[in-house]
Amino acid sequence: MRNRRMTKVAVLATSLLISIFTVNATECTVGKAAVMPVAEKHGSAGAFIGKVGDIVLIAGGSDFENAKPWEGGVKSYFDKVWAVTDAGGRLSCREVEDVRLPVPLGNGCAAGDGKTMFCIGGMNADGRSEDIFTLSGSLDDLKVRSFCSLPAGFVPNAAEYHKGYIYIIGSRDGANSLLRLNVGSRQFKELAPCPGTLVTEGSCFVYQHNGREEAFYLIGGRSSGPDGIFMESNVWEYLPTHDTWNRKASFNDGGKPLSLMYGSAVKYGSAHILVFGGDDGVEFLRRDSLGRDESRPEELVEAFLGHKGFSNKIFAYHTITDTWTTLDSLDLSLPVVTTAVELNGKIIIPSGEARPGVRSEDIIEVSIADKASFGWVNYLVVIVYLLLMMGMGFYFSRRNNGSDKFFKGGGSIPWWAAGISIFATALSAITFLSIPAKAYAADWGMFMYNMTIILTVPVVINFYLPLFRKLKVASAYEYLKERFSGSVRWLASAFFCLFMFTRIAIVLFLPSLALNAVTGINIYLCILMMGVVTIIYCTMGGIEAVVWGDVVQGILLVGGAIISFVWIVGGIKGGFDGFMNVAVEQSKFNILNMSLDWTQPVFWVAILGGFSNQLLTYTSDQSVVQKYLTVKDTKGTEKGLWLNGLLSIPIAFLFFGIGTALFVFFRQEPQLLNVGMSNTDSIFPHYIMCRLPVGISGLLIAAIFAAAMSTLSSNINSSTTVMCEDFYTKIRKNCTDAQKVRFARVSGIIVGTLGVLMAIALATFDIASLWDQFNFFLGLLTSSLGGLFLMGIFTKRIGTRSAVTGFVGCVVVLLLFHRFSHVTSTLYGFLGLVSCFLIGWLSSFVFGKGR
């Protein structure tokens, strides 16, 4: 009786434990969505397939129209072109009238940029073709044009388009070969060949990012020669930046290596490659053997007729963890000798070969969804946190009785609170997500970037802080008026306000995008919750609400990070020892990369870039500088800065450790990855949602909200301070103290609302690329702002005109580096500061000394 009762309790406890976990489930929906309009239910295998605009083209290919192979039939080739269209979610396929290929062709390869499809090589009854031609235009005006010819003797296997080039994997003179075709100049360049076994046909060749850099993946294939037919299961990674190949985890099903030929593969999400079906070659080799034995014709016919169809599985390869998983096993077998193409968020697999010698007329549609449920308990946790922040705003609004209190807290903020506030402001939600994501996807190469805060703090304390404290500036840019002129101050202030507006939108949009992808929370709700609550508490309570809000948020996000790290490591096979062993084996703790590759985050890049960017933040960013004056005296500010710097060291270890732990966990459990994850920055919230219990996951999501809101509140408050001190009080010289506070609150609401609206626009319209360019240009100006302070503090020679020349020259130099070099953007802060100072200093010999 007692045992029975204990069993019931155990079952109940297990059920309860399972129920409190939030689970992200990947669902694959596969079906026959349309048929090709061909006679007698025939289709086309080995066609050129690709997307042109909003249609998928199927050009050429082959079939056994008159008799099947076991009946002695001969393969015939097509010159027709068919188009698959999507009208309101319903697929249809029709022949494109009056459009024909130059000659009937099949078994070539296709690649394209979404506007033009390049058809490469192929063969027909007359032999192999070395021609490349294009298909482009609309469905009503589709054009076939000759493009160029392949190098003599080169036989293409597969191709992929990327950034103006077509990479073509193939063979020549009995060896592997890789060519790169420059689409603009139509010139070929021979690249490093794959060092693996010769593969001549049937491979998948797909571009995908590997977490560190761009890469191409060659999967499977086959070749034939005097020794017979060889099937490949190997996977090779090609790195175009270095022109090198790396051997990766072999194609496998449940850990069992499996040969693969003529599967269909597509890039999916930020780091997955999906492989649909394919042939393992077992039955193919049997038929080949029977075909060579003339004494067993009946067995050969039986082998053809008894074939059950090709693989029914969808496989997923994850480029970061180098792991294979079986995503789904379907009720229908998938065709081979075809190409999978993405169309309007779905994957289309047209026609192909259903069984040996038998074409498929079906157009297969695949939809993949990763469903997540946030749950009412998690919502409750987040709502309680948001109400707490609003209450803080109401509390401090009753204590603000003047502009000095609103902008500088009356100098009454404890030094430790100011230090935590500076720390929390610098650790935005983007950082909260991106540091673990960077360590997860790559290694600790950027760790030293965070450590440079220890180099920055002494410079700020000894050279910048005395001036800010002496002038008692509410706006950092008041110093520029004293050192140069009012026009330089207004220039800097205007660009700072514009940059803050863009930063507010980005700080709202990017975390909301990541949270929406993994939690299912509506992206607009995310933006509005963070934006509206932050606007309320920071405009009501002023800098005091901002600082004390940062303290609460800093404690929440650090506490949440500690919980996460402990939980992740606890879920790794082997615990902490297992975590360390895998991380060391995979070189995830690599910090001291001493190479002089300025395109990568090597040691020198991290040190120079980190120090320069930290210096920019702590000397010219109003959202940080403003907090220097919230403390009673200079000594207190110094202690606050040192606290911020010292906090950054263990926190860097913590967040890089979380990223490495995520890598180890998902390398062991790749089936738990979200295949549709569009950005690697979502990996941390994805883990939070799929592995942490309800309530705890809500607390961690609240921590991400906190990281975003601490930055947002400082951005809004600093913008209103600059607008009030640098513009409003200069226009209305006799304004009262109450009018200044009223203006600050109204301008804070306006700036915050504009940022929210811009974030909503980014989430609604396809303007992300345009916005990125705009934000990039404004980002260049931050180097110029830092350069103005550098010129003003470290030399007396530079005057107003020289300072403006340095400001403009810095932007030009950075634009030139961006356009004509591959230098990593991590160095832009260093390049900007140096160029701004040097150009300003040199121009002072033309314009004369400053004051």
Model-predicted regions and their roles:
Residues 4, 23, 288-289, 329, ...:
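Composition- and surface-driven signal marking solvent-exposed, interaction-prone regions
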Residues 10-20:
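Bacterial N-terminal signal peptides
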Residues 22, 126, 283-284, 545, ...:
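A subset of signal/propeptide-processing and intrinsically disordered low-complexity segments
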Residues 371-851:
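Membrane-embedded helix-loop-helix hairpins and adjacent transmembrane boundary segments
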Residues 20, 139, 846-847:
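Short, aromatic- and cysteine-enriched interfacial helices/patches
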Residues 25-374:
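Kelch-like beta-propeller repeat domains
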Residues 1-11:
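Bacterial N-terminal signal peptides that target proteins for export
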